[in-house]
Amino acid sequence: MTASKRLIRGVSGASLFLFSCAVFAHFPLMQCWSTGALIECEAGYSDGSKAVDYQVRMFDYDDNLIAKVQTDKRSIATFSKSADDFYIIFDSGHESPVEVDSVEISEK
């Protein structure tokens, strides 16, 4: 095999490895539910890992911060239920933040 063919194969293999890593990336997920006077949200990642000690924020529809809490050791963030419409955001710092609107939250 000539040196140029080996170089092309080496570059092709390295490119395939680098670009295939993106396939294995994980993205943030969050599911929220209502339990009486509380809203609970479980934050995590698509690979099944938990999001422990991450900030989760609640905003009203005018984008005013209502509350911010940290996820616990179970990846659960707990809020007091707001009388107004709201949305909750989990921003893990990479990929896109996850947003759950109050109309999407049902009783557990």
Q: What does each model-found stretch correspond to?
A:
Residues 16-24:
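C-terminal segment of classical bacterial N-terminal signal peptides
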Residues 84-96:
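Short, aromatic- and glycine-rich surface loops/edge beta-strands on solvent-exposed regions
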Residues 2-14:
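Bacterial N-terminal signal peptides that target proteins for export
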Residues 23-40, 62, 100-107:
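Beta-strand-rich domain onsets/edges
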